[in-house]
Amino acid sequence: MQPLLRQVHAAVAWLLVGSIVVQVWLAGTAIPQFGGTGNFETHRNVGYLIGLVALVLVLTAIPTGLGRRRILQSLGILGLYIVQSSLPYMGVNAIEALHPVNAAVMFVVSLVYARAVWRDRAATAAA
């Protein structure tokens, strides 16, 4: 059962990475200087769905048997998401401006994590 759970977990990790790429694209299409309307509603709504993916990442990490380290790493990604969704509402422009910076950090951390759990999955399948 664990090999299947590890495959599901790896797929969720890659889904998160892909979702972040789509989210950045949605933000770019809304920016008026790039021809957008200035309406970030779709970007915001999809962002909330990404939170569900991040939560599923944590929930699927627990039964995989990959250990405490992977569970804590997935919790860290969820933490980055919580920060990400809070930044636009801080009320201080200098802090709100960290929203795209945190998005980049979340993307890199999620990408590194997805690659690692993909390798973990492959190692389990080969054994």
What is each stretch, according to the model?
Residues 1-127:
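Polytopic transmembrane helical bundles with strong interfacial aromatic enrichment
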